[in-house]
């Protein structure tokens, strides 16, 4: 199959054949040959050739193409959502919101370019100081599987607006979504070579990341892979490296009047997208005592009734399958490890079928675990930690090398003010789920959760570099010469 998009044309890959499957049914979704090292070379060379003309194109002309892409996303919303659902297992209702977010981020990215980059002029005594922004050149974009349309475009859209050209390596678990998205870019009128698609598994990614002709690498994915990339580019300051990675995110539940509202937000935080959002709550901190007991009883009751089904089931389920049978088995293994360390099961996770990705929402009380592993389990595995007071809750919440998202459910604003001042995370929410984020706000975290702020407003910052100039339209001698100069 012609599954690579290089220099404006679909081409056959010369790498190994691989396939994606619907994790809820096992049916094949996509099959094709990945990109070899030579294919990656051709893709980077194509992007390099296209850079001069694309970066010289008027900003309004670049934005017009990007806006046309957004319009086509709206027109083709159902087809793309169906592909997302088939390949990732997420329910159609959620896949549709992903496509809508892809389209909405375009206007945000254009506004961000104007407000955070663009051009600024300031008069000086003998001319004008001008701040402009220049694109880096050829950038590699690595996309994840959990939002295979939305998250890569959080890098691609601002990169293209700024004048960069792109080589896109999607997750090997969602190649069909990548192909469908690139087809929309092609139909939007993107010139040949401006966006190139290299499908493939690990070897393709290594070839792209190691290429000496890329000027930047923008990555969304696991902290382990991002850390390897960070180590790889040590000693290469010329490479712009933007990493958006995972988190071991805490949600602190305080005594609140509306227990059902707190349970709802905890369910959304822990189990939305089958727990496959980097901002999902992995640890839910619950107070000791009667209120905490009532909260946990209600939380377990609601979680036990969450349905998980195929992406196009009618009625629609809250959760679909996780991305693969292998991912499901890893989650069950992670649960077993926590149980061995002393965790108490409240709802135990089980894999419905060893050949599929269905697992149930699960809850473990890990309070008895003396040394709780600081790990991100990417699925519906909620860990309960009981705490004594607010200081104890914040200390436990901050006991992580990650720092992506955190949340507080509390009626008392003074509690919130203390929490927001002392918690360490890039996204900190009050009486909202931990995975709720504004498109117009920075998205990203501290510590092992990454650097920069991709996917939204601040993405413009790493897609172009500032160029400062002091300018005068007339060449003339200064009124006063420096000491020691004689003309």
Curated annotation (Swiss-Prot):
Keywords: Arginine metabolism, NAD, Oxidoreductase. Pathway: Amino-acid degradation; L-arginine degradation via AST pathway; L-glutamate and succinate from L-arginine: step 4/5. The keyword Transmembrane does not apply. The active site is at 244, 278. Its EC number is 1.2.1.71. InterPro entries: Ald_DH/histidinol_DH, Ald_DH_C, Ald_DH_CS_CYS, Ald_DH_CS_GLU, Ald_DH_N, Aldehyde_DH_dom, SuccinylGlu_semiald_DH_AstD. Belongs to the aldehyde dehydrogenase family. AstD subfamily. It comes from Burkholderia mallei (strain ATCC 23344). NCBIfam families: arg_catab_astD (TIGR03240), PRK09457.1 (NF006992). GO terms for molecular function: succinylglutamate-semialdehyde dehydrogenase activity. It comes from the Bacteria. The lineage of its organism: Bacteria, Pseudomonadati, Pseudomonadota, Betaproteobacteria, Burkholderiales. It catalyses: N-succinyl-L-glutamate 5-semialdehyde + NAD(+) + H2O = N-succinyl-L-glutamate + NADH + 2 H(+). GO terms for biological process: arginine catabolic process to glutamate; arginine catabolic process to succinate. CDD domains: ALDH_SGSD_AstD. The gene is astD. This is N-succinylglutamate 5-semialdehyde dehydrogenase. Catalyzes the NAD-dependent reduction of succinylglutamate semialdehyde into succinylglutamate. NAD(+) binds at residues 221-226. Pfam families: Aldedh. HAMAP family: Aldedh_AstD. The keyword NAD applies.
